[in-house]
Amino acid sequence: MGKRDYYEVLGVGKTASEDEIKKAYRKLAMKHHPDRNQGDGAKASEEKFKEAKEAYEMLSDAQKRAAYDQFGHAGVDPNAGGAGFRPGAGGEGYGGFAEAFGDIFGDIFGQQGGGGRRGAGGQQVYRGADLSYAMEITLEEAAHGKESQIRIPTWEECDTCHGSGAKPGTSAKPCTTCHGAGTVHLRQGFFSIQQTCPHCHGSGKIIPEPCTSCNGAGKVKKQKTLEVKIPAGINEGQRIALRGHGEPGTQGGPAGDLYVEIRIKQHEIFERDSDDLHCTVPVPLTTAALGGAIEVPTLSGSAEIELPEGTQHGKTFRLRGKGIKGIRSNYPGDLYCHVSVETPVKLTEHQRKLLKELDESFRKGGDKHSPTSKSWTDRVKDLFK
């Protein structure tokens, strides 16, 4: 699954004020804090707590919020909050929580759970953030499938320092604040609160001489070309997951995923409804009246429809199997052709004369030539009885 929209996570609109964002976060944090949720639902509550914390950290910072509003998750700079800032890591623990609430949870919960998942060396390990990419394709491409290339901006491991963040020939040192633990304990009265170390941001290490290529981040922004296989029958809004092509993890953590979300261009002829297609077919007045064969378009060529004599405007003809075979469908949908009877325009004098003669002959025949008009006239008469 991709990362949820930060505004959706907090339950606020995109125009929410700082106070509204903070209030929404406090409410969610109180509800889902791990110390308040034990038993079967503990893990789900913990994930929601982390998700709300991440959303708040992003939207409470004006610069990060502006970048997120413009580019979404893909545009968030992982170094905006210093070398240890990792948006979307999902395992950052609860550090910073006490900073947002002051003494509230120190009084309520006591010791606070801390730290993210740790690797073999004791360092906190973070999964890279998921990225999203909107890809626009034609209806034909959606129906038949295609292979395409996309170029995306992404963060990759720095070639100079190989992801360490340290200048070549040097190395990171244990953090003197947390002594390499990545977390610190704060005393508040009778309570002890564990939170992410504010000095090393949970890494347990400090880089005395940062790499000049990545400024100590361990990763740099690059353009990456990826092959995307679009399956036949894909629909608007469906996503294709490219595993491991999101942002790289930190401290040996796994990379996130890239989700390619499909947008289908508006077609000049067809409208799609699930696996079915709809189109409007213009028909001359004379053909509708006299009947005859007409040619209609399909995604695989053209087909022929035999119009019966007296075809009315709005009549729908169904061509079975001429729609789209969806990804999870066993059979293709149908094509619905909606007749649009066209009234002739720009008539010559001779044509006008012929139509007037035809009109007079219709009037002499009464309502038998216009069944719809007859029923409408009867309804009007009934209305005024």
From Swiss-Prot:
Provide the binding site for Zn(2+) 2.
175, 178, 197, 200
Looking up InterPro entries in the UniProt record yields: DnaJ, DnaJ_C, DnaJ_domain, DnaJ_domain_CS, HSP40/DnaJ_pept-bd, HSP_DnaJ_Cys-rich_dom, HSP_DnaJ_Cys-rich_dom_sf, J_dom_sf
Entry's localization field:
Cytoplasm
Q: Where is this region: Disordered?
A: 26-48, 362-385
Offer an example of a GO molecular function term for this protein. Answer: unfolded protein binding
Q: What is its main location?
A: cytoplasm
For this entry, list what GO says about its biological process. Answer: chaperone cofactor-dependent protein refolding; DNA replication; protein refolding; response to heat
User: Required co-factor?
Assistant: Zn(2+)
What UniProt keywords are attached to this protein's entry?
Chaperone, Cytoplasm, DNA replication, Metal-binding, Repeat, Stress response, Zinc, Zinc-finger
The residue intervals holding the CXXCXGXG motif repeats read 158-165, 175-182, 197-204, 211-218
**Which Pfam family, giving just one, matches this sequence?**
DnaJ_CXXCXGXG
Gene3D superfamilies under this entry?
DnaJ domain, Heat shock protein DnaJ, cysteine-rich domain, Urease metallochaperone UreE, N-terminal domain
Q: How is the cofactor bound?
A: Binds 2 Zn(2+) ions per monomer.
Gene Ontology CC annotations of this record: cytoplasm
Residues in CR-type zinc fingers: 145-223
Q: What HAMAP family does the entry give? A: DnaJ
The record's comment about this protein's domains reads: The J domain is necessary and sufficient to stimulate DnaK ATPase activity. Zinc center 1 plays an important role in the autonomous, DnaK-independent chaperone activity of DnaJ. Zinc center 2 is essential for interaction with DnaK and for DnaJ activity.
Quaternary data: Homodimer.
Function according to Swiss-Prot or TrEMBL:
Participates actively in the response to hyperosmotic and heat shock by preventing the aggregation of stress-denatured proteins and by disaggregating proteins, also in an autonomous, DnaK-independent fashion. Unfolded proteins bind initially to DnaJ; upon interaction with the DnaJ-bound protein, DnaK hydrolyzes its bound ATP, resulting in the formation of a stable complex. GrpE releases ADP from DnaK; ATP binding to DnaK triggers the release of the substrate protein, thus completing the reaction cycle.
Please report which protein family the annotation says this sequence is part of: Belongs to the DnaJ family.
What name does this protein carry? Chaperone protein DnaJ
Q: Which gene encodes it?
A: dnaJ
